[in-house]
């Protein structure tokens, strides 16, 4: 039985929803995502990152995450919560971090978050 191909829009929709929940947790002390939501999102990341080329979405997810984080840093001037958000995002994108990022020697997910907030803070200064 062939595995279903997961498209970028479906993948990013699940990731973005979970990242928004993490944003509320980190910056507004919101409710944590349910285990079902979190496990579904991590499973989608895993499947999307292990699909055979040209359907492998690792590069697209990394790029979109970087863009999402830059936008988040511009919206959230408050530095409180950055480390919590970075930990949550790293956990969600663990598979991407462990294989794609390491193989291409890219900045790790936590470093992407910190760099985005540092750049936003420098732009405001």
Which residues make up each language-model segment?
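Eukaryotic scaffold/interaction segments
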Residues: 1-125
